[in-house]
Amino acid sequence: MVYNKAGIHDSIKGQGHWPETEETPTITLFLDNLDDRSLRRVKQLGVLGISIAQLDTGGLETWNDENLKRHIDRVAEADLELRNIMFDPGERIIFGQPGRNEDIETVINAIQIAGRQSLPVMEYNFYPHRIVEGYKVVPGRGGSGLMDFNNDRIKDLPPLTGKTTISLDELWDNVTYYLKAVIPVAEDANVRLALHPNDPPAPISRGSGQIMSTVEGWKRLTDIVPSPYNGITFDCGVTRELGHDPVEICRYFGERDQINHVHFRNVVTRTPNLDYTEVWVDEGQVDMFAVMSELVRQKYPRLIYPEHPPENDSDTEFPFDGISATTYTGFAYTVGYARAMMQAALATQAATK
């Protein structure tokens, strides 16, 4: 059997297939490794875009042209594309500590390498601590495990041992300093940066502020250097966790060309920022078809990551360690759902032209 790059057998090309193009989103999964079995499994799901958390050699300080090209070529051997790499700016940048200029130079060097090797997106976080202590697993449909967050579990937690705290104003000063240094380089390199919202979006994380815990913060962040290269990871789940309409917020940032990556998941929010449950992608408060339709309407051309599938028996009984912490069956479900939403949105909008 001979398949083309999109994974479609010659005999069924054109038979009801909506290909991902330069004017449509592309589904992605994060891979823990680039082994043959991992690449094969995501390709079987129709995933074309690959994301990774870092190079197999470590953080940004290990980046060079040869190293990044090796990863890109490895993915290309499977007729897939490496299109996003997560990175950690480092504590000295986030806290504004001595040595941050050296760390900013490390980020700049990595961006320039990414540009030379045609890596289109680099995604990052900017927080002192991710307050995951507020999560617990609660039962969902059929006994599946859902991630539940409540701020009461973490609101009085002290800083971690040996760690300091930082105010919201200080964080804004530090991210401003950072962005003004790196965004001009990203523009020259044609590499878009995507800052992920705080998730969980609690106002305080072990005594420190969180700049990306409100939509107002997202807007402020993108206004520091108004550029498509200074963008966000638009997460429709986090948007709903904050009590906002995901379609409206998607349109706001899309009109400014500052959506550089998308996370696609559903939630049930009881109190914005403070109390919510991540649920199966087909059962929450987010109108997932409306979100996908808005992205398709915008001709958003970058990655969509259908993240955070609930725990399920299949993954518990038959773990697979190549894809985002042993949740292959869960991701098969979320990928299939996201692909169906995208195909439906493309077909619907084509029919109304």
Regions found by a protein language model. Give the residues of each.
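Active-site-proximal loop/turn and secondary-structure-junction residues that shape catalytic pockets
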Residues: L31-D35, D56, D88, F126-R130, ...
